[in-house]
Swiss-Prot record:
Positions marked as site (Essential for catalytic activity): 144, 182
Cofactor comment text: Binds 2 divalent metal cations per subunit. Magnesium or manganese.
Catalytic activity annotation: D-ribulose 5-phosphate = (2S)-2-hydroxy-3-oxobutyl phosphate + formate + H(+)
Presence of keyword Manganese: yes
Gene responsible for this protein: ribB
This protein's record includes keyword Manganese: yes
Residues that coordinate or bind Mg(2+) 2: 46, 161
Name assigned to this protein: 3,4-dihydroxy-2-butanone 4-phosphate synthase
GO biological process terms held by the UniProt record: riboflavin biosynthetic process
Known function: Catalyzes the conversion of D-ribulose 5-phosphate to formate and 3,4-dihydroxy-2-butanone 4-phosphate.
SUPFAM superfamilies named among the record's database cross-references: YrdC/RibB
Pathway: Cofactor biosynthesis; riboflavin biosynthesis; 2-hydroxy-3-oxobutyl phosphate from D-ribulose 5-phosphate: step 1/1
Protein source organism: Ralstonia nicotianae (strain ATCC BAA-1114 / GMI1000)
EC number(s) from the headed UniProt entry: 4.1.99.12
């Protein structure tokens, strides 16, 4: 077999475009069950893997995994409409970050938390923020959860984990809000593709790419247009 053949790389084979529907089905099932999904962005972008959990289905075990295995910067991905209802303003007036990541001010639940740092407290904060009746009185700033605002077009507008999180939650039939944290290695470096696949296999988690989500949405749009 030629050494340049993608099939010679078992990890590359995991991302066969023909298997995208199966990867998406596994990821959406996991979102509905509150199981983390390992999502990779493009190799020429951040080239990082995030663990993503539907905000509606967040559990103590899921949050503990985010804190233990990831960077510790737990982010809540929201639509612009939800962020506005919560009264969340941008973290800075002029966003100069490399990828335009739309951080708002950090938040804490107004009631029900102590220091806000524990897994239980961060879950309380996220539940307060995504509750159907949540408003600007539900949370305070600063805090230990970092909201991110997704662009309206999702991954078709911006190929970021923020948009991927909201798209996955919406595609799973849940509220359009996701919780994410960047996967890290024990030595403090960021997990890349092969590291992320090994982690997913060790923990029995589905793995997919932002490209998978974009292709899935494009296929859905074509199916609707031809219906």
């Amino acid at each position: 077999m030629p050494s340049g053949d993608a099939s010679a790389d078992p990890i590359e084979a995991r991302f066969d475009p023909a298997a995208m529907p199966a990867r998406m089905a596994a990821a959406l099932d996991a979102m509905r069950l509150g199981i983390p999904v390992v999502v990779l962005d493009d190799a020429d972008r951040e080239n990082e893997a995030d663990l993503i959990i539907a905000a509606d289905r967040l559990t103590h075990a899921g949050m503990a995994m985010l804190i233990r295995e990831c960077s510790g910067i737990v982010c809540l991905c929201l639509t612009a409409e939800k962020a506005a209802v919560l009264g969340l303003r941008p973290m800075v007036e002029h966003n100069r970050s490399q990828y335009g990541t739309a951080f708002t001010v950090s938040i804490e639940a107004r009631v029900g938390v102590s220091t806000g740092v524990s897994a239980a407290d961060r879950i309380t904060t996220i539940r307060a923020a995504v509750a159907p009746d949540a408003d600007a009185q539900s949370v305070v700033s600063p805090g230990h959860v970092f909201p991110l605002v997704a662009q309206a077009g999702g991954v078709l507008a911006r190929r970021g984990h923020t948009e991927g999180s909201v798209d996955l939650a919406r595609l799973a039939g849940l509220s359009p809000a996701g919780v994410l944290c960047e996967l890290m290695l024990p030595d403090g470096t960021m997990a890349r593709r092969d590291d992320a696949v090994r982690f997913a296999d060790q923990h029995g988690l589905p793995v997919l790419t932002i490209e998978d989500i974009a292709r899935y949405r494009e296929q859905m749009a074509r199916a609707v247009s031809f219906a």
